[in-house]
Amino acid sequence: APDPQPDPQPAPDPNTPLVPDPDKPLEVLDVSALNFGTFLYSGMNWNYWNSKEAPDAKWNSTADLSSWKHGASPLGWGDRDAGTPFTMPAADRAITNYFVRDVNFGTLSADFEVTLDVRVDDGAVIYVNGTEIKRVNMPEGTIDANTRASSNVGLTTAKNKLVRITVPRKLLKDGVNRIAVESHANYAKASSVTFDLTASLVR
């Protein structure tokens, strides 16, 4: 009798996000073929740095991210729906956590537009290619890893009041662009510090 054939493997569910290898850097997200629509969803993967030690000074522009961790959003602590919960003891939590995603937009038109919707809990500074484009609930002046958010923001408020930002066209370039966010707690033992971001484009 002929050898039995193995059962066919089911096709992957296109709605299931791919889980990257935790031991390899997160790949650049290629959206060069997308003409319009959302390209970063809640639940997608981000590089993150959640150590009390500050990352490389060029973390938001050109720094190598191979030593960073990565996981699905939302990321942080205090949110039971977190895709990547930060489970370290409260004493080891950092005031500031850093999040990065590199995106290949391909060739850009003069009218190319990117819009971000950011969850801010408690404060945040948002960058594109190393240039600050928005700070929310943060003090003026120089920001560093020990800078606290200006006030506490509850998790429910953060989830329901996303901050919308249109990225200045002059900051975007052909090829790979870096979207980066630093999230700041209002105090060391804040009950929640979480990050999430969705983004859309129009060519």
Regions found by a protein language model. Name each.
Residues 128-130, 199:
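Conserved aromatic beta-strand anchor motif in extracellular beta-sandwich/beta-rich domains
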Residues 64-100:
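Surface-exposed, low-complexity/disordered Ser/Thr/Gly/Pro/Asn-rich loops and linkers
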Residues 19-20, 25-52:
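Boundary/junction segments of secreted and surface-exposed precursor proteins
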Residues 133-134:
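Short hydrophobic beta-strand segments in globular cytosolic domains
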Residues 46, 68, 95, 103, ...:
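Aromatic-lined ligand-binding clefts that engage carbohydrates, nucleic acids, or primary amines
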Residues 139, 148-203:
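An acidic-aromatic loop/edge-strand motif
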Residues 1-29:
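Ser/Thr/Gly/Pro-rich low-complexity, disordered linker/stalk segments of secreted
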Residues 48-64:
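Short, tryptophan-glycine- and acidic/Ser/Thr-enriched carbohydrate-recognition patches
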